[in-house]
Amino acid sequence: MTNIRKSHPLMKIVNNAFIDLPAPSNISSWWNFGSLLGVCLILQILTGLFLAMHYTSDTTTAFSSVTHICRDVNYGWIIRYMHANGASMFFICLYMHVGRGLYYGSYTFLETWNIGVILLLTVMATAFMGYVLPWGQMSFWGATVITNLLSAIPYIGTNLVEWIWGGFSVDKATLTRFFAFHFILPFIIMAIAMVHLLFLHETGSNNPTGISSDTDKIPFHPYYTIKDILGALLLILTLMLLVLFAPDLLGDPDNYTPANPLNTPPHIKPEWYFLFAXAILRSIPNKLGGVLALAFSILILVLIPLLHTSKQGSMMFGPLSQCLFWALVADLLTLTWIGGQPVEHPYITIGQLASIMYFLFIVVLMPTAGTIENKLLKW
């Protein structure tokens, strides 16, 4: 008699994805972030569900409903802070996951990579809309500034912005629709993530060497299930340290002031995970140019498979590529720092240089390094 996990229609899918899946024997801890993102997503959906039970998406009561959750609901404070800091953990894992894909050449799996880029954009949209919901000062002004960017689109811009707002400014209609979208998107993300996995399992995982590992596979369970559990425990430990000891560390104090359309905060800035994008956006003096640079800073990921010149799959054996990769990481950290600084003399120039370097690294320097490494191999 066949094992039920191999014959049952539903169990068979789970078995082929998480139990008998042939996995490379040499994948490092950088391959843990996929499962950690799954853990983050489930955690965000669960905490978000419980928050939605007490939240009201009305401009007059939204701010006080969040206060009510923190003060009066049983363990509401921990649910709220797990959700807010869970978003930060989500983005840490996301950026690590994308960085791993870049470093080890996982972008050669085109479908998986492109669906990953769609996932990244969807998660960013979800996080942005979630940040608007508490209806604090930074929520309101962040929503105003970011939605206003669409008015830079020629001809249809103004109509488009007013259509998204549901009026002539960010108001009740905007908050209600953002809540609706923020609720539905995580489920859409879950569906896209399943397609992401489906395409990944068509080819099998990549590995640090960038060489096919078909000759050396091990079963996913127990080897990688136990490894993923360890990763998840470390993730939850880090999250709970943040939630219980420094819940407001990554937040903005301005968001504890209720939204006031008549009073603009001195520095309108997004959450830390969008600061690099904000820095690229504001380093270009022209509005439309800034919006295009902002969009392209993420969409450039789609072009990376086309810009791959190296004969090696991975950067593991490419010293030049490695140097450039880590310089790119340093550049992104610089952009993140600049995004949090006021728009004044030294910061503007640093931001512009870092923005130029960001695109230069990806479009020019890394492909050139790949070509040089090919030459070195022949030499």
Curated annotation (Swiss-Prot):
GO terms for molecular function: metal ion binding; ubiquinol-cytochrome-c reductase activity. Heme b b566 binds at H97, H196. Signal peptide: none annotated. The chain crosses the membrane at residues 33-53, 77-98, 113-133, 178-198, 226-246, 288-308, 320-340, 347-367. Belongs to the cytochrome b family. One of its GO terms (cellular component) is respiratory chain complex III. Binds 2 heme b groups non-covalently. Heme 1 (or BL or b562) is low-potential and absorbs at about 562 nm, and heme 2 (or BH or b566) is high-potential and absorbs at about 566 nm. Pfam families: Cytochrom_B_C, Cytochrome_B. It is a multi-pass membrane protein. It comes from Bison bonasus. The cytochrome bc1 complex contains 11 subunits: 3 respiratory subunits (MT-CYB, CYC1 and UQCRFS1), 2 core proteins (UQCRC1 and UQCRC2) and 6 low-molecular weight proteins (UQCRH/QCR6, UQCRB/QCR7, UQCRQ/QCR8, UQCR10/QCR9, UQCR11/QCR10 and a cleavage product of UQCRFS1). This cytochrome bc1 complex then forms a dimer. The lineage of its organism: Eukaryota, Metazoa, Chordata, Craniata, Vertebrata. The keyword tRNA-binding does not apply. Keywords: Electron transport, Heme, Iron, Membrane, Metal-binding, Mitochondrion, Mitochondrion inner membrane, Respiratory chain, Transmembrane, Transmembrane helix, Transport, Ubiquinone. This is Cytochrome b. The keyword Metal-binding applies. The gene is MT-CYB. Heme b b562 binds at H83, H182. GO terms for biological process: mitochondrial electron transport, ubiquinol to cytochrome c. It is found in: Mitochondrion inner membrane.
